[in-house]
Amino acid sequence: MNTKVQSAMENLMLNTDDAYFPAGWHEEEVTSISDDDVQVMNEDGTPKTRTGDDGTVYYYRNVRTQAAMVTLDYDGNVIAMVGGLGEKTKSLSLNRAYGVTRQTGSTIKPIGAYALGIEYGLVNWSTMLNNSPLYLKQDMVIRDEDYCRRNGLMGLTDKQLKAYPNAWRSWPRNYGGNYGDGSDLPLWNGLARSLNTIAIRVGDLVGANNIFNFVYNTLQLSTLDPVNDVGLAQMVMGSQTHGVTPMALAAAFQIFYDGEYTTPHLYTRVLDRDGNIYLENNATSYQALTSDTAYVMNRLLKNVLYSSVGTASGRYPKSNGMEAFGKTGTASDEKDLWFVGGTPYYVTAVWWGYDAPYDMTKTLTKQQAKTRTCVMAWKALMEQAQADLPYKAFPASSGVVERRYCTQSGLLAGSSCPSTAVGYYRADDLPDTCTYSHGASTQAADPAAPAEEAPSQTVIPTDTSNLDTD
């Protein structure tokens, strides 16, 4: 570990006066109380309890949000790691950075659908994709769980449910509940804004099986479920059975440096007192993506921070002019909030939520939950960690070129295109040149502005009420 970065992370995660992570206290029902719990008491001073039908006595404790943070370098070395908020009081306490899995939300989009879409040559920087649901209500693919509950239809099979047109809904929705405006958007814009309607179309092109195989086997996200997580909802929207750990997610984002993946490790070797090797690190390194795809993805994820439309717009670290990339993520019902960010030196994953998953908007306002707490904590850490480091750039790939594209067609700009912007493309997979007869100019947002094999069958979880994540 790097003592400077570890110290900075520990100080940040003390979270003095809830500086980064609001508490969001709420009552939690448990079957036993420990000395460390903040027990809920009645007005008369007696413990608040409830007795179940089977005689079980339930107690209540006040719990607050927790957080975890882990930083790696691009050789897989664990630079710093903190597994919880506040002062550490136990040597073997729960470490949420490597010992607890969480649903990824949208942080899985770039490492799966988008990366493979670029790698396979299915999409590029400016591929136009429709901002609308993949499945419409009339397709009768996705159940409307709320409607089914209200009308006593939960026990019906899909075949039986076909008799109830209102028992279905369009899918996916974007974060906030909208279904998109039906316009065509360039891929970079959909990724920067974390639009589910755009990501799901890329995922449908790549295929859920291909995405799962890549993130499970190549990126070693081994806590994903090989049976229940092979579907677009899980592989694009991040609604997995168990999810992944912050350390595993940080390791997966290593690939946006130069395409290489290295298993994370805490040591290189351990020697005994005589200098003999007692333990040797068995980390493995290999090329997960081509360097060309990695650099295109790096530029795409830069937009999350540097574009005026990015979900973390303007929240990049001020570190001697060094660039950064990142991805926000929110799991179902605001139960898990994420940010994974990279600089030329480090890649970091930050998680914020409750130990027992709970809708954070029930204890915090939606604005509080969406103030990008995780990205601001990452920004503060990187500004400290990189304060004295010399300038370093991400490695550009010789197989990637900058080209102007037509903002109306997404093709390379032709002589008659009235509105153009700059994109990054693999030199061996350039779009055609636009020859369309254009109407009125429509300028896309400037990305530089500061501030599956054949598509596989979608596997839909039994409960589809929480499939729309950020």
Describe the function of each predicted region.
Residues 122-211, 232, 273-303:
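Conserved catalytic neighborhood of penicillin-recognizing serine enzymes
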Residues 73, 88, 118-127, 222-226, ...:
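Secondary-structure transition/capping motifs at alpha-helix termini
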Residues 92-97, 230-236:
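Surface-exposed aromatic
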Residues 2-61, 65-71, 78-83, 87-100, ...:
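A penicillin-recognizing enzyme superfamily signal
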